[in-house]
Regions:
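C-terminal cap/loop subdomain of S1 sulfatases and analogous C-terminal strand-loop tails that border
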Residues: 151, 191, 198-299, 338, ...
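Catalytic-site neighborhoods of secreted/periplasmic enzymes
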Residues: 1-53, 218
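Polar, surface-exposed loop/tail segments
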Residues: 8, 13-17, 136-139, 178-243, ...
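Active-site-proximal cap/lid insertion segments
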Residues: 32-191, 195-205, 257-258, 262-298, ...
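Short alpha-helical segments and helix-capping/turn motifs at coil-helix boundaries
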Residues: 21-30, 128, 151-153, 232-235
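Hydrophobic beta-strand scaffold residues
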Residues: 1-3, 141, 248
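Short, compositionally stereotyped local motifs that mark structural "simplifiers"
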Residues: 314, 324-328, 335-435
């Protein structure tokens, strides 16, 4: 497969050098070899939280996508041009009860919906390009967002407003078109499902399970799990378990308020308005919940009758059995995944990088075995990448993943590098028999 990413890399660690054939604003399936299978990701940042207070132009807004590699400082052509609203002033907006119903909040929500309309057009662009390339009916298209909404009390929290996301799968030739699927799905299911869709068996080390494809799991999820720890410059620890109807949350730092003063989020007009109204005593009881000085140790919500998760049932005797069930499931899950949340960050860093020195991946070792080059690395978990210097003349092409011995040829020059995620990459090792 030819694998591309355009272009966000918010991985919390440096990616492996073999992660992508290309990851840039130019990355596209159109750069692959003819008839090569492809896997392409496009991240439309227009609906990102920051676009509520600073709606800016991106490379997707250029007349040609992907742009030519000589585009230069493309953003300069948008200097001084304000983003318009793509929705009318009369748009009907339903404000959730945890936010004030006033013009400031309504204007942020209007911009949010405008950004969604704009994003929808970008999705249409990609679908049109697939159609133009006669690939639309040969390609599985998966659409989803990376977390819940961008407004206060949404992103960063484990309420459904922060973790529930839309997802659409389009199969070729209208297969299962219009079907609605209410299964519980977790993001840890994405990797095994992707492999399953490509007829590749998922690995045993995957925490998730395939929900589509050849290796689709026979067992549906009974629960999904969620975790929240560091929020930019602030730290907390919350865990959650949800079944189809009920959500359990465990707050490991109940002495901390839910609201944390994140400098980045407070650029938002709605956030500034919430702070102002809290200080002046203008918030109602539901809106004040987020500003409590302490959190309950446990929370339980019926998401059917209380979709905004505002009525905590953890202390209600009628729900003690459900509370016990989900509480035990939370503990069981944390044990199964060896949850590192309770470990202080300094100790966690020390366990990864002793003395805070980043480990270095061992250099790859090249052996000529018969008519093949066999390459290995002593660093457990490292990926090995290679470039055929005598063939790969395009400088932007990424490192190919080494997965099998390379046939020996006269006049060949091959570069190898090894990299384990979290480590520094190895030095480049070159095999050459060229004159």
């Amino acid at each position: 497969y030819y694998c591309t990413n355009n272009k966000k890399e918010d991985y919390q660690f440096y990616k492996s050098l073999t992660a992508w054939d290309e990851s840039s604003i130019f990355a596209h399936w159109r750069n692959r070899d003819k008839d090569q299978n492809f896997y392409s990701i496009f991240n439309f940042g227009v609906t990102h939280e920051s676009n509520l207070w600073d709606p800016w132009y991106r490379h997707f807004d250029l007349d040609t996508f992907p742009p030519g590699r000589g585009i230069g400082k493309w953003w300069e052509q948008f200097a001084g041009i304000e983003k318009p609203f793509y929705v009318s002033d009369s748009i009907k907006i339903s404000i959730p009860p945890y936010l004030p119903n006033n013009d400031i909040v309504r204007n942020d929500m209007k911009r949010m919906y405008s950004n969604i309309v704009e994003m929808d057009g970008k999705v249409g662009l990609i679908l049109k390009q697939l159609e133009d390339d006669n690939l639309l009916e040969e390609t599985i298209v998966v659409f989803y967002t990376d977390h819940g909404g961008p407004l206060p009390r949404e992103k960063r929290l484990l309420y459904d407003s922060g973790i529930r996301v839309p997802m659409i799968i389009r199969y070729p030739n209208q297969v299962r078109a219009g079907e609605v699927d209410n299964r519980l799905i977790s993001f840890v299911d994405f990797a095994p499902t992707l492999l399953s869709m490509a007829n590749i068996p998922p690995h045993k080390f995957h925490q998730g399970r395939a929900f589509e494809g050849k290796y689709k799991s026979k067992n549906k999820r009974k629960y999904i799990y969620a975790a929240a720890d560091r929020f930019d410059e602030h730290y907390d620890m919350i865990r959650a378990v949800r079944d189809n109807q009920y959500k359990y949350l465990k707050n490991f730092n109940p002495e901390k308020p839910y609201y944390l003063p994140l400098e980045y989020r407070e650029k938002m007009d709605s956030m500034q308005e919430l702070i102002r109204m809290n200080q002046s005593g203008q918030l109602d009881n539901l809106q004040l919940q987020w500003f409590r000085n302490e959190k309950p140790k446990e929370e339980l919500f019926d998401t059917y009758s209380d979709p905004y998760e505002l009525r905590n049932l953890a202390g209600d005797p009628k729900y003690k059995d459900k509370l016990y069930e989900l509480k035990n499931e939370c503990s069981k899950w944390m044990d199964e995944v060896d949850d590192k949340g309770p470990m202080p960050e300094e100790e966690l860093i020390e366990s990864f990088w002793p003395n805070k020195i980043q480990p270095i991946t061992k250099d790859p070792v090249i052996d000529k075995v018969g008519d093949n080059l066999v390459v290995s690395c002593q660093t457990e978990g490292a990926n090995i990448g290679f470039k055929l210097s005598h063939q790969d003349t395009l400088t932007w092409k990424g490192w190919r993943p080494y997965i099998k011995p390379i046939a020996y040829e006269e006049g060949m020059k091959v570069e190898f590098k090894a990299h384990r995620i979290g480590y520094l990459p190895s030095k480049k090792v070159v095999f050459s028999n060229a004159n």
